[in-house]
From Swiss-Prot:
Belongs to the argininosuccinate synthase family. Type 1 subfamily. HAMAP family: Arg_succ_synth_type1 (MF_00005). One of its GO terms (molecular function) is ATP binding. GO terms for biological process: argininosuccinate metabolic process; L-arginine biosynthetic process; urea cycle. It comes from Pyrobaculum aerophilum (strain ATCC 51768 / DSM 7523 / JCM 9630 / CIP 104966 / NBRC 100827 / IM2). One of its GO terms (cellular component) is cytoplasm. L-citrulline binds at residues 87, 123, 127, 174, 183, 259, 271. This is Argininosuccinate synthase.
Amino acid sequence: MGASKIVLAYSGGLDTTVAVKWLSEKFGAEVYTVTVDVGQEDDFSKIEERAYKAGAVQHFYIDAKREFAEEYIARAILMNGMYEGVYPLGTALARPLIAAKVVEVARRLGADAVAHGSTSKGNDQVRFDVTVKALAPDLKIIAPARIWGMTRAEEIEYAKRHGLPVGEEHKKYSIDDNLWSRSIEGGPIDDPLAEPPEDAFKWTVSPDKAPHDPTYLTIEFEKGLPVAVNGEKMSLASIISLLNHVGGANGVGRIDHIENRLVGFKSREVYEAPAAVILYHAHRDLEKMVLTPRELRFKHYVLDPQWADLVYQGLWVEPLRNALEKAAEEMERWVSGEVRVKLYKGSLWVVGRESPYGGYSKELADYSAGWYPSDEEARGFIEMWSLHSLTALRRRK
C-alpha cells in the first residue's frame, strides 16, 4: 500500500503520536495531522506542539463544535438517540464528522491516504472507514494500530526510542469526551462487578455529595429541539454546555451498562452525559404530550431505536438514516412547548409539561367533572374493542 501524503486524524494521545513517526518510517510519506474540536477538554496548543515534535509536516486545527451540535447532536435529540436505550451515542456521532473533516483536508492537500488511531477491537474503526469510503472511495485508509501489532508497553518504548513527546504512559483510564458525552474505559472499569471508582468521574458529582435542595429547569422546545432554558434563549451548543454543568452538579447523567459492540463482543461502558440524559427525558415526555398513540409507538419503538442502531454501527451514511429522520420530521414539527424537570441527587423527574399542540384535555381526563360516555356508548365500545380477543378465545377452547 503506497502513499506519499497521509492525513492523520490526530488526538495527541499515545497511539496517534506514535502513528505520526511510524507512518513516516513505514511509507516514507509526508504526514499531516488534523485535530477536530467537537468540544473535548483538551489543550489544543499542546496537541499542535506535540504533532510537530512527532514529525508532522503540517498540523490543522478545525473548530467543529457548532456543526457537531447543529448537524449531529440535533438529530440525536429529535430521534431520541440512545443505543440500547442507554448510551447517548456521543463518540458514535463525532466520528463521522471527524472523518469528514480529515477527508476535506486530504482533498485540499492532494493526499492519497488518510489514517486514524483506531484498533481492530474497537467500534471507531468501522465508523471512520465507512465514512471515508462513502466520501472519498479513492483514498487509501491506513490504521497503524491494526498493522503494527504493538502492545501499549511497546508503543511507549517506541515513543521513548524515537524521542516522541508522550506524557500519558500511565493513564488509569481511556477517556473520550466531546460536547455530548464523556466515555470512560479501561482499568477497574473492565471488571463488570466492580463499582466505578469516584476518580473516574469528572463531569458529575457523586449523588450523595450533590446539593440537598432540588434544582428545577424549564426547557422550551420548538419543533423538537431545545431553544431556551428558564426563559433564556440560547444556541444549542450553549444549552448543552449549561445542562452538562447544572446536571453534573446535581449528580445527574452517570451511565453504567453492558454494551453490545458491533465488533462482536460485550463491553462494560461508563459514561457521563448530563445534558443528553436531561434532554432525552424532556423531549420524549413532550412527544408523549403531543403525538397520537400511533405516532408515538411508531417513533419510539421503530424509528428511534433503528436510528440509534445505524449510528452506533458506523452507518451514518446509510440512506435509511435520512429516511428515518424525514419520517420523524413530519411529527416533530408539532413537538413544541415547555417541559419542567427536577434534578435531585442523581435523579431526574419530569414534573410538568405544556404545549399548544398537546393532545391532553383536562375536561376529558377529569373524573370529577366534564364529559362521560353513556352506558350504551361504553358497552358498544367495549364489545367492538374486545371482539378479536374474545373470538379467538372462544374458538380455541
